[in-house]
């Protein structure tokens, strides 16, 4: 265990008196400059007796002055608070009423205790807490550079002394600044190491930095938390450069007053010797008590940068040492780096094989005889692992809801069963295998009939590395993490109500997941293959098709080109293969979504393999747009390219609010004989995750009315989709009720805009009226 500490010593001018205090919330000693003494004052009407029954209730807390910090920062430093108000209405302290009702005993002990736990007691004024609040506020301002700050708490009572409003009056005084920063004891660093050390400093420099380990700060206000951050950064930097024995005690910060409004800081460091990685000793324990032990020794590296990995495995039959070897991010003989040790631990945990992962470094005793400076000592690395049971079987029940299917079914509600088997270490190298089978049925809620039955089978294999021939990308790109996933799925669906069935819809995908940094990830889908074989049941044309697109004599969709496209989309067997690259950058919590960003860009090229087969092999003279496979006209394919950009930002809005924004841009373009892209690669707009004022897939294309006037079709689901999609959204979320019924209650206001359009190659809706919309962008 490395115990850390820093000393901050302020040297005042000789003529000034000096007092040393330990600020709250800091492990540093700071010189406190003489200033106005803090006082706790009360108005003449304040309550003198502090007994429980006569203390006033705090109705409000205000801050007068202290504009250097946000209101939320000041509120977070004090413990004197008023009771919560329902929806912010003055005097409407709902939770106090609940507490007092439960405390009255009129509803019995059990109900009373439940009400008291849901409510909160009256916020009575506590002078001891108030005095501590004054000290905490003073410490905040002094630690942040306002060395002469003083705080006074004023209590104003009303209603005969029963209520009190607390005002913290802050006199911050003039700020002080960093002037010059100097690092001492780092002469052993190379010029490149010095440049990186200065470039990453938490205290910005005023001008160009050199390698002298000294620079003038860029008018940054003096801040003890900033010095602590710089210490943490310096510790991390040195530990990643081989100085494994450095601790917080090794760094001392001497803060000297250089002028009435500025300080110089000398950071004095004792780095200790520089170390290299040594041999790796691994102990693995498994859950199979009947299995004996085995011991393997692996050679790591060659020449000077070489060593051994000694693996001892107990009660585990399947695990191979190569899994651990592949997860190592360091090499024996290389310079010690704490980051590489942590990355090794993270990669071992990411395999999912181990329930316990512990990586430790054996640092020698500082009293041992020193070695020659030119010979760096090697540090042995110890890894202790415990594997999890490999086999898992899961049975689950689920519910589902669908609406607007083909614009015919208004609402479907269903349930299903699922069974899955997982093997966490299939071949001994961390391969996670999963196979699952699920089935579901759904019915129309209003008519109380069964409408859809579905059966789905899926399987996947995920390995914690990049497979050949892509394995070299891990070291070449210096990836933070990497894995490969192979998956297959097959779906069969039958809907008597829609007179429609999918005999088989299958897909297969090989994905390379490359995490460059903790926030940036690349996803490469190499051969993504999918096929769909729809079929129609008796009565499909009469009950469904004529209702959606009409007959030739009474068309609902008047454009014959678009009528033919709908028939092709939903009744013809189709094939698609795609290469897809996704670049994703995100630092936002996907569940809370309170602060951060999420950016995603996608480039996709599809159906070019069947296009090349059709053009070069199957029918060199013509390009038919179909593969002669199966019965009938064969498999339909449509080559295309597809681009997507999705940007989302989340920022705090006040103390309990979030301002969220989203911009989505999508473009799809056919590149083969067809003038449209596959229907499952088009864009749709409308619904809960899109433009929320419209139903699912109800918007577009453009402003066109795709259904003929007077048609009986309802819902007007956009059957065509679009080749271009633009959407923007702004949303404000604010928590209005906190901790009520064990939950926080929020309201949201949003503004959505967007639509989809036909692209330049799509013929759109043909019309003789130049003023009638065609659906094109």
Model-derived features with residue positions:
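Bacterial signal peptide processing site
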Residues: 12-13
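C-terminal transmembrane beta-barrel domains of outer membrane proteins
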Residues: 16, 327, 351, 398-400, ...
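Periplasmic polypeptide-binding modules associated with outer-membrane biogenesis and secretion
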Residues: 18-403, 412-414, 436-448, 474-478, ...
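Secondary-structure boundary elements
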Residues: 237, 241-244, 517, 586-594, ...
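Residues at beta-strand starts and edge strands
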Residues: 2, 55-57, 147-149, 162-164, ...
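Gram-negative/organellar outer-membrane beta-barrel architecture
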Residues: 19-23, 196, 202-209, 317-318, ...
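Bacterial N-terminal signal peptides
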Residues: 1-9
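Extended amphipathic secondary-structure runs
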Residues: 127-157, 235, 340-341, 500, ...
